Amino acid sequence: ASDVDGRYRGTDLHVHQLKEDEGLHYTVFSLWDTFRSLHPLLSWIEPGRTRDFVRTMLRMYKEGGQLPVWELAANYTGCMIGYHSVPVISDAKAWRIKGFDEELALKAMVQAADSAHLGLDVYAEMGYIPSERESEGTSKTLEYCYDDACIAQFASNLGNSEADAIAERFRLRALSWRNILHPESHFIQPKRSGAWARDFDPTEVNFNYTEANGWQYTFFAPHDISGLMALTEGKSSFSTLVENQFTAPSLTSGRDQPDITGLIGQYAHGNEPSHHVAYLQAYTGNHWRTQELVDEILNTLYTSEPDGLCGNEDCGQMSAWYVLSSIGLYPV
């Protein structure tokens, strides 16, 4: 977004000037998509670019008052869910990428997580977002939990008592996803205030989930896979649940959702919530099954034709999944 002379439009919609040592300023942060594969890949192969991404995010916080969620041309947009600048910043520190203000980064991340909008207030109070209180509350609960885990990891590596207290607070809050895993069905299900929503159908696309259904969001606790396996009665039962997603009929109910494409059973590779699921079989000891599933996705859902992607490229996420999977890696 910065011009050749270092000028850029900030999220306060004023023009600012970069200093010579401040790198580049970026735009188009499709973070709900790209935090999963693209940014982890770039942290590995382009650490200097990731440093500038983080610097850009922190400038957006200073100039506009909050970290980007889905920023476009200096506009916040309010599109999609989560506060997924957080995993990008946390991953940068995990890779020991230097050149950004870590104390400011922690302050910005905590501000994002402690905001009172988009169900965050009730999430902090109740440990989940009741379906009657907020649209897409089930998905928001899960993604807030993951982002909280990333805050905890970042803070725990700062090495001071104040950051340690922040790390512990968010480590505990990151486990809140367990409040919406049904103990009998083993699905992540919508929950009202104090009671499970009735007539749950894991194939139904509705207002409780973000561009997905119960099948596609049940496996989103990447920071707590061991807990997910334990609450679904262990590795064998969990392995069966994952397998059933890939062998279930490829039919959805509820509203029409054009983003749910590239189906193998109820696994939807054309949209991001499913992207890590094939790799979960490795956690159950069935590495061979992960290999089979990843190979099937690579060879059936990507081609070199003009329509060679089974879904939206989403600013590099679909291609980054292919690159990482082609070399046998994935950042669950």
Regions found by a protein language model. Give the residues of each.
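Active-site core of glycosidic bond-cleaving carbohydrate-active enzymes
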Residues: 24-36, 45, 86, 96-332
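Structural motif corresponding to the C-terminal cap of alpha-helices
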Residues: 1-4, 18-19, 61, 65, ...
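Short coil/turn segments at secondary-structure boundaries
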Residues: 28-29, 41, 45, 77-80
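Helix-terminus loop motifs that line ligand-binding clefts
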Residues: 6-20, 49-123, 182-192
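Glycine-rich phosphate-binding loop of nucleotide-binding enzymes
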Residues: 9-11, 36-45, 49-58, 149-157
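Beta-sandwich/jelly-roll carbohydrate-recognition scaffolds of carbohydrate-active enzymes
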Residues: 1-26, 277, 311
